[in-house]
């Protein structure tokens, strides 16, 4: 079976979506099937195409971990306005379709959203290739955009909802990252369309760090005492401004604990600016780092923060940060209700507090401080639980079995295509 994966998120960019797609591709390979990836030229987080990918034309062919990858030009999104975002998304739709012309003998097309428009690419390419089309859903758009105030109810929202349902109708199968997503999609998709949960998951080995916590703290200069670390995107969806309020409370109450935020994003500048207006806050902001360095920060911590906005729709989400943080073997401070909270409590991997609630966060930090042995046990339970239930390897196998069902190819019968097999378009 030859699977064509279409996504706007893929290495060498780093991040949760990129890591998930890479793991799924590895899983397809591990089962003996072949894979080709079509993605955008790397541009995260600035929206500007990386220098190494500027030359070579509209489509650049590279190999990443022995998988042929076609990197497509996109309309660069410097300012992230509504117009530039639409141009950004639609340019990928057009270029990804063109890029598919050189990919031959495709049995299944997996289009991973967001953005929603990538589903349009997947459907059109699957028609051109006469292949099965699987729509992979990692975000409930436009519902999330409306809930976050990024999209007003009106014509644009109605068009977005129509497009979402259109893609669901055209898909031969749908995968989604949470049970809540599956339930929401079932209400909009045809009754006969099969839906599978393929969660974000983690690679536990990525979070095994040989250095001691003490040496890591010295090297990373994060101080002594109790340290809670957040390593990830600092966007509106994460809702981390309450970290500043929690730091104020800890200062005023004389609680000897600090928070270290490692990451960048749309909300960071305003949060840093607000924190700077207060004196003697035990909160520090650092720039984003790669996965290996993030794992070192996590290993140096006493606890790991896993927040999301208090916007109700986020109770349907399971942030990928949840699984990675559990794999790091540290107790979690989770502020996401719903499925995420259920996983945390089933694993006994940490403490939950209400989203964007600084009082709840401070109380949870104090509770872990008072019981270091119990906190350590939480971390150990979390690592064991996530390795058993949510490894990306196991999630990739779920996807492969689903693709085999849809294509009727239960056993591998294809070899990995080389760059030479990406034939010239006629």
Where does each model-flagged region fall?
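N-terminal subdomain of nucleotide-sugar transferases
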Residues: 1-65, 250, 415, 420-426
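Carbohydrate-associated surface elements
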Residues: 180, 201
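Acidic anion/phosphate-binding donor-loop and adjacent secondary structure
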Residues: 186, 192, 202-219, 239
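Conserved donor-binding/catalytic core segment of Leloir-type glycosyltransferases
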Residues: 222-238, 243-248
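Nucleotide-activated donor-binding/catalytic signature segment of Leloir-type glycosyltransferases, i.e.
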Residues: 262-263, 268-296
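Short hydrophobic beta-strand element within catalytic cores of glycosyltransferases
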Residues: 303-306, 324-335
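Conserved acidic donor-binding segment of nucleotide-sugar-dependent glycosyltransferases
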Residues: 346, 351-358, 367-373
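A short, well-ordered alpha-helix in the C-terminal region of glycosyltransferases
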Residues: 360, 367, 374-388, 398
């Amino acid at each position: 079976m030859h699977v064509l994966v279409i996504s706007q998120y893929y290495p060498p960019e780093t991040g949760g979506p990129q890591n998930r797609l890479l793991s799924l591709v590895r899983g397809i390979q591990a089962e003996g099937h072949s894979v080709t990836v079509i993605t955008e030229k790397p541009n995260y987080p600035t929206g500007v195409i990386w220098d190494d990918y500027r030359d070579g034309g509209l489509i650049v062919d590279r190999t990443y971990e022995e998988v042929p990858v076609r990197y497509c030009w996109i309309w660069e999104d410097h300012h992230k306005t509504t117009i530039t975002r639409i141009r950004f998304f639609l340019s990928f739709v057009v270029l990804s379709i063109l890029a598919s012309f050189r990919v031959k003998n495709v049995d299944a097309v997996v289009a991973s959203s967001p953005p929603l428009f990538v589903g349009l690419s997947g459907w059109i390419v699957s028609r051109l290739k006469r292949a099965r089309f699987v729509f992979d859903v990692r975000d409930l758009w436009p519902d999330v955009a409306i809930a976050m105030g990024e999209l007003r109810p009106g014509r644009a929202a109605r068009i977005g909802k129509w497009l979402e349902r259109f893609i669901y109708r055209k898909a031969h199968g749908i995968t989604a990252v949470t049970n809540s997503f599956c339930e929401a999609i079932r209400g909009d998709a045809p009754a006969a369309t099969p839906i599978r949960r393929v969660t974000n998951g983690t690679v536990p080995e990525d979070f095994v760090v040989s250095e001691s916590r003490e040496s890591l703290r010295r090297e990373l200069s994060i101080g002594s005492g109790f340290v809670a670390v957040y390593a990830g995107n600092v966007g509106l969806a994460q809702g981390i401004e309450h970290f500043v309020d929690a730091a104020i409370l800890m200062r005023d109450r004389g609680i000897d604990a600090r928070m270290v935020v490692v990451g960048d994003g749309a909300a960071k500048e305003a949060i840093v600016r607000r924190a700077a207006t207060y004196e003697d806050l035990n909160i520090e902001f650092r720039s984003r780092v790669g996965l290996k360095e993030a794992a070192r920060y996590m290993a140096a911590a006493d606890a790991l923060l896993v927040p999301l906005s208090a916007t109700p729709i986020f109770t349907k989400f399971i942030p990928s940060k949840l699984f990675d943080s559990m794999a790091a073997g540290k107790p979690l401070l989770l502020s996401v209700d719903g499925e995420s909270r259920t996983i945390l409590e089933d694993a006994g991997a940490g403490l939950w507090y209400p989203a964007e609630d600084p009082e709840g966060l401070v109380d949870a930090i104090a509770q872990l401080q008072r019981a270091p042995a119990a906190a350590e046990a939480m971390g150990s339970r979390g690592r064991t639980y996530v390795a058993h239930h949510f490894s990306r390897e196991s999630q990739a196998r779920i996807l492969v079995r689903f693709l085999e069902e849809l294509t009727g190819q239960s056993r591998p019968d294809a070899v990995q295509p080389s760059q030479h097999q990406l034939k010239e378009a006629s």
